[in-house]
Amino acid sequence: IVASNRDIKVWNLSLGSKLEIKPNFISPEAAELDRIQSEYDVSFVVAGTNIPAGVTKKNMRIGSPADSLNSMVVNAVDFAGNSASYTRIGPVLSFFHKPDVSYYGGDGTVYTDKMVVCKDDMGAAYVAGTSFAAPWISRKLAYLIHIMGLSREVAKALLIDAAAGWNRRDD
């Protein structure tokens, strides 16, 4: 698909595995995303994967393909800016910090704490997840690349720098 749409430079992937990545390996899916990005000069924005329903593990590692080194991986925060209860953590290969950024993905048990999306019947659905945070970052990245004319590397670096701030702690 990427090869047939060379004018599209930013691709959103709001999907991911329920399984955790292995500590010292890159998944085949992530390796393929990295290859495509290099070969076609595109960027993938990947949802940081959610902790599956029913799993009580608090510090669950991200799932594939969020272990892609060159993709912009997005976690979710609630509307107060706190990490959402379902988000997962990196690192990848023990030292690459993933996810790269976080954005509003909704959280909580009441509808006002969630994201509002359109349904097929023209109604509204109240949802939460990293899959709803990632498209917002895709839009920002596409703006920097397509409108501002920045390279994908510079655009990604600007978004990460703006998100991390100077007081970043990687505990």
Residue ranges and their predicted role:
Residues 23-30, 59, 68, 95, ...:
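Conserved structured core elements
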Residues 2-5, 144-150:
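Flexible, small-residue-rich helix->loop connector segments that border functional cores
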Residues 61-142:
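Extracellular S/T/G-rich loop segment that most often corresponds to the catalytic His/Ser-adjacent loop
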Residues 5, 68, 162:
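Acidic-histidine catalytic/liganding microenvironments
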Residues 1-64, 124-128, 132-133:
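Substrate-binding/access-modulating region of protease and related hydrolase catalytic domains
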Residues 17, 48-52, 77-79, 107, ...:
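Acidic, glycine-rich active-site loops and adjacent beta-strand->loop/helix elements
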Residues 146-171:
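C-terminal subdomain of the subtilisin-like protease fold in secreted/lumenal serine endopeptidases
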